[in-house]
């Protein structure tokens, strides 16, 4: 006989696809006429970006591009650069139809190599790694109670974070940044660096208010024979994202990434290029969760008949911390040459790892520091060196398994010259992350009692004397003898289910 089970709905995020894809970057191109011939290549830099995502049944298509910047010097030892856009489209086949699912895709350059075939022709080879996650909010039924006085149930409540939804919004930023009066007019742009960081997220009913900043640095060649100069700016933004069902008691894990970045010099009223035009497209993504206590049954048995119990394992996730912080890294770097002048220093995050230890989340990784400089003979030189960083963040320890996928961006980078062959790098990093606890619980999802198979008992025995062992629980003892938990507590005059080692119990069997 199938028992009358009271069931309730539990909402979870189900990962339909979670894997890495690889996109090759293979191209050869010729420099345009306005670019001088290559004498020496300093650096080939590649920045991949996902521009758009689409889902069609069991297929996901990602469209994007890789911005490849070639930094080199010509025969007259002048700094030069050329930017090449490599478009791509990547399709992933999913194990089943995923209509209505959410897509999160992050692209990172695994490696990039370039070779000057001639003074004007360049061959590039590389690969972009894309982390793709396709997930959907699903509903699972669990048993919260059983309506039968002959059934013993073990009721528990589990704190869980119920996923309320996932929302994305694109933000366009258009800004013109004029040069200062002390800076020379722009002849050409050598290199650009940009990053975006979420500073604050506030939840109001059905909406998330996201505040953040975009950081832009531009290295350019001035007109005439001047040394390359730098423009740096910070552009704040604020945006409202609609998320149905969220309240001010919910938590929100919000991240930002740059999808499109176009930086060009602009001609001003003086008929000179004295302004930088910035056109950016930023993707804001928010995963929202609300805390809840979920009633459930972890075990059950019949005191009279044999029963078939079906179980399922459910993994609950809960946000324990949300982080939006900045931290500073200082590292000294020994150079392979004596410097006459440093033109520019920049950093990029190469990799990042997290571990949890003694109530702290430790974020560590590698920064690649690049230096444009001139040596004692005023010859252009490029130097790069990896340096490690580590940052510790306190978090609330829990019983579950914590995990975190932090977003780390370089906010600013500066330097101090210590000696002719040594400099100190000051890097400000912004970290944005949600720390999650994952807890897997085995639950009763169905129960069927076989009334044709009564539990065999010794009819001459109405009570058993049992000595509790070290690992025994009152529930295990009741289950072993198919006895009533309340009757055991009543006969033994117990106020709680706590047992002392070696305690003698009277277990009524009728």
PLM region descriptions:
Residues 2-460:
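Membrane-lipid interaction segments
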Residues 452-490, 495-510:
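Primarily a LysM-type cell-wall glycan-binding module
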Residues 1-2, 413, 504, 510:
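Gram-positive cell-envelope targeting signals
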């Amino acid at each position: 006989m199938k028992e009358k089970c009271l069931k309730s709905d539990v909402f979870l995020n189900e990962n339909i696809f979670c894997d890495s894809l690889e996109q090759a970057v293979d191209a050869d191109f010729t420099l345009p006429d306005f670019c001088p011939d290559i004498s020496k290549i300093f650096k080939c830099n590649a920045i991949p970006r996902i521009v758009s995502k689409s889902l069609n049944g069991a297929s996901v298509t990602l469209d994007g591009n890789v911005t490849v910047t070639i930094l080199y010097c010509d025969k007259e030892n002048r700094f030069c650069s050329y930017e090449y856009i490599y478009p791509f489209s990547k399709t992933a086949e999913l194990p089943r139809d995923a209509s209505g699912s959410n897509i999160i895709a992050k692209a990172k350059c695994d490696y990039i190599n370039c070779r000057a075939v001639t003074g004007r022709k360049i061959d590039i080879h590389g690969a972009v790694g894309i982390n793709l996650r396709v997930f959907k909010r699903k509903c699972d039924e669990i048993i919260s109670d059983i309506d039968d006085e002959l059934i013993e149930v073990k009721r528990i409540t589990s704190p869980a974070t119920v996923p309320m939804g996932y929302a994305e919004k694109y933000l366009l930023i258009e800004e013109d940044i004029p040069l200062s009066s002390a800076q020379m007019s722009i002849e050409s742009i050598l290199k650009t660096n940009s990053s975006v960081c979420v500073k604050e997220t506030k939840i109001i009913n059905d909406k998330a208010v996201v505040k953040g900043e975009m950081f832009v640095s531009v290295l350019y060649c001035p007109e005439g024979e001047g040394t390359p100069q730098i423009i740096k700016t910070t552009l704040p933004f604020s945006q409202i994202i609609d998320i149905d069902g969220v309240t001010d008691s919910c938590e929100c894990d919000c991240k930002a990434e740059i999808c499109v970045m176009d930086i060009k010099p602009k001609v001003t009223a003086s008929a000179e290029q004295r302004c930088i035009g910035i056109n950016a497209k930023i993707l804001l993504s928010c995963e929202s969760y609300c805390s809840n206590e979920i009633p459930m049954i972890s075990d059950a048995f019949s005191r009279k008949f044999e029963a078939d119990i079906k179980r399922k394992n459910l993994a609950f996730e809960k946000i324990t911390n949300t982080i939006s912080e900045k931290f500073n890294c200082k590292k000294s770097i020994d150079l392979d040459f004596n410097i006459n002048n440093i033109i520019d220093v920049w950093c990029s995050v190469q990799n990042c790892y997290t571990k949890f230890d003694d109530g702290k989340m430790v974020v560590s990784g590698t920064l690649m520091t690049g230096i444009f400089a001139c040596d004692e003979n005023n010859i252009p030189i490029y130097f790069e060196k990896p340096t490690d960083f580590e940052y510790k963040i306190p978090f609330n320890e829990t019983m579950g398994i914590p995990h975190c996928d932090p977003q780390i961006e370089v906010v600013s980078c500066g330097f101090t010259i210590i000696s002719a062959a040594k400099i100190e790098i000051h890097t400000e990093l912004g970290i944005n992350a949600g720390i999650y606890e994952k807890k897997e619980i085995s639950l009763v999802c169905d129960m069927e009692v076989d009334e044709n198979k009564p539990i065999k008992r010794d009819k001459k025995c109405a009570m058993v004397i049992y000595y509790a062992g070290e690992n025994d629980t009152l529930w295990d003892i009741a289950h072993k003898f198919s006895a009533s938990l309340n009757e055991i507590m009543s006969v033994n005059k117990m106020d709680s289910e706590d047992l002392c080692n070696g305690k003698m119990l009277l277990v009524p069997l009728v």
